[in-house]
A protein has these predicted regions:
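Short alpha-helices
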Residues: 1, 50-54
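Hydrophobic alpha-helical hairpins/lids featuring a short glycine-rich hinge
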Residues: 1-34
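Short acidic/histidine-centered micro-motifs embedded in hydrophobic/aromatic stretches
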Residues: 18-25, 71-75, 194, 330-331, ...
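Terminal-appendage/accessory-domain detector
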Residues: 14, 92-102, 109-351
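Active-site histidine-anchored catalytic micro-motif
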Residues: 44-50
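Alpha-helical scaffold segments in carbohydrate-active enzymes
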Residues: 21-28, 56, 74-81, 103-110, ...
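Short, surface-exposed loop/turn segments at secondary-structure boundaries that line and modulate
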Residues: 45, 77-86, 197-205
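Active-site cavity-forming subdomains of large catalytic enzyme subunits
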Residues: 10-14, 31-41, 54-75, 82-94, ...
Length: 351
């Protein structure tokens, strides 16, 4: 959306409208798979994200209804993205966010020139819902029910931590224990995490007890708990490969067990619940339970929280607080901005 808005010199309002449409598609499509696409080995960031990006691109290109349908059909035929990266911490995890956006623009531009695609790309017997679902476990009603009236993306989450969104619950619980009880990491005997089945599948496979790189750290429940108790936080500073060989971190990882909680599994995927219990060397136990992690629409962050997160990350990248504040000021009045390319000039000029 930002790339096309830059090249087409679209206004802030144009950008907001296009992104809203794309976000609605990705949320509805993801919901239709009932939380199970992962079990089929597909990566929703890529598979659902490409369909969303093609709608955003079509809107920015000013395509009519028929050509927007073509764009969806073309994009659906180009969808890809496997979860294979998860066992090796492969960088294809990153690729599967940018690659679908690139292909979505290609799909929309092809449609703009009259190249057609299947109009029933979602519901066809050989379409996306069947092909990418786990054992045909999907519900097509979520694609169109209340479309244009009930904006489902307004209930999507904002990530608080620089790692997998499924990590939010147990990290919130760990840091709640830290804030309330101030346990010394050296005195922790063991850590137990209760979670849903898929969260375990993603973050607590046996290989997650031996992380090797930064991507692994972002998808390792034992590491995240260990470093949260050691450092009392989980920021980009904790995504440091030096910690992999830290003796205390290694001991805490080895002391961590993860078990499925039947109630949390029943509530998934509507809720990403988690609970953490630590046992100290003197036998004292501390527990925290999180129904909905921070950033969920039922446990929301504030706009200021989001801005501060951006400031923290942008200042690390740019080393220039003046530029960071210029970006914040631009976005604060995004709906009144006549030319999105001005924002991209601020964002892209990294030296």
């Amino acid at each position: 959306g930002m790339a096309l808005s830059e090249s087409l010199k679209k206004s802030g309002k144009d950008y907001i409208a296009a992104v809203a449409m794309g976000n609605e598609v990705v949320c509805r499509m993801g919901t239709a798979y009932l939380g199970d696409m992962y079990y089929q080995g597909f990566h929703p960031t890529s598979t659902c994200g490409m369909m969303a990006a093609s709608v955003t691109a079509a809107k920015l290109l000013g395509l009519d209804v028929q050509k927007t349908i073509y764009a969806q059909g073309i994009a659906g035929s180009m969808v890809s993205g496997l979860m294979a990266w998860n066992t090796e911490g492969s960088f294809t995890k990153r690729l599967q966010a940018g690659h679908p956006a690139m292909n979505a623009i290609i799909a929309a531009r092809m449609a703009s020139k009259g190249f057609n695609g299947p109009s029933d790309i979602f519901e066809s017997k050989d379409g996306l819902l069947h092909a990418y679902s786990f054992q045909d476990h999907y519900d097509p009603k979520y694609i169109t029910e209340g479309l244009g009236e009930d904006w489902t993306f307004t209930k999507s989450s904002i990530k608080v931590y620089p790692c997998c969104r499924y990590s939010g619950g147990h990290l919130d619980a760990c840091l709640e224990i830290v804030a309330k009880h101030h346990p010394k990491a050296e005195d922790i005997e063991k850590i137990e995490i209760r979670s849903s089945k898929y969260t375990m599948h993603l973050l607590a496979e046996p290989c997650k007890w031996a992380p090797r790189n930064i991507v692994d750290l972002q998808f390792s429940m034992p590491y995240q708990a260990a470093i949260a108790f050691k450092n009392g936080q989980f920021t980009v500073d904790e995504l440091n490969e030096d910690y992999i060989n830290d003796e205390l971190v290694k001991r805490l990882i080895a002391s961590t067990t993860v078990v499925m909680d039947d109630e949390f599994e029943r509530r998934y995927p509507a809720h990403y619940s988690s609970a953490v219990t630590i046992t100290m060397k003197d036998g004292t136990q501390y527990t925290a339970t999180v129904d909905d992690p921070k950033g969920d629409w039922r446990n929301p962050v504030t706009y200021e929280d989001v801005v501060n997160k951006f400031r923290y990350l942008a200042n690390r990248t740019y080393g220039d607080s003046a530029r960071t504040e210029a970006i914040v000021e631009f976005v604060n009045s995004l709906e009144n901005q006549p030319d999105m390319s001005k924002l991209m000039e601020l964002v892209n000029d990294v030296r």
